Amino acid sequence: MPIGVPRVRFLYDEDTGQVWIDIYNRLYRERCLFLTHTINTKIGNQLAGLFIYLGIQDDPKDIFFFLNSPGGGIISGLAIYDSMQVVRPDTQTICVGLAASMACFLLVGGTITKRLAFPHARVMMHQPLSTFFETQTGDAVMEVDELLKMRENLIEVYAQRTGKPHWVISEDIERDVFLSPTEAKTYGLVDVVGVTLI
């Protein structure tokens, strides 16, 4: 029998009083966002929208972005990343399980000094992937060209946010690189290893 999503009480306003809402909506209202699935267009749009919504509120408190994801689509991931960068409040990124591929990119995209990995988390970075074995030759060439542009874009951001030279990032992402939280801190992907939010 599925457990479902628990509902909790929330004081909506003085007129309405308390209402029951699911726990994720309650946490969103406390400025806590979660990425716990593969990144796709739907997830990307939802998270980008939530970042923008929280960013336009008149509240300077940090946004907490919890990551436990195998990664996913580049375009949707970049939409989330760009939304994180344009909002006024700082974004604390927290890896609670696995931040792989595009989720690693989002982890490094948090406000510098406010990127955290829990002690038993894992971080994995690699170059963008694509499958073009079923496309026509012309389409495959265009896709490869676009993929190379995205790869350079990702390398640029990783280099800026980790302090590593471009060539180091380029060589390292040639294969899957799994890092412990301590290794991720040494690399510059996170700033803190622990369980206390900054």
Curated annotation (Swiss-Prot):
Pfam families: CLP_protease (PF00574). CDD domains: S14_ClpP_2. One of its GO terms (cellular component) is endopeptidase Clp complex. The active site is at 101 (nucleophile), 126. It catalyses: Hydrolysis of proteins to small peptides in the presence of ATP and magnesium. alpha-casein is the usual test substrate. In the absence of ATP, only oligopeptides shorter than five residues are hydrolyzed (such as succinyl-Leu-Tyr-|-NHMec, and Leu-Tyr-Leu-|-Tyr-Trp, in which cleavage of the -Tyr-|-Leu- and -Tyr-|-Trp bonds also occurs). It is found in: Plastid. Component of the plastid Clp protease core complex. Cleaves peptides in various proteins in a process that requires ATP hydrolysis. Has a chymotrypsin-like activity. Plays a major role in the degradation of misfolded proteins. Belongs to the peptidase S14 family. This is ATP-dependent Clp protease proteolytic subunit. It comes from Cuscuta gronovii (Common dodder). The lineage of its organism: Eukaryota, Viridiplantae, Streptophyta, Embryophyta, Tracheophyta. The gene is clpP.
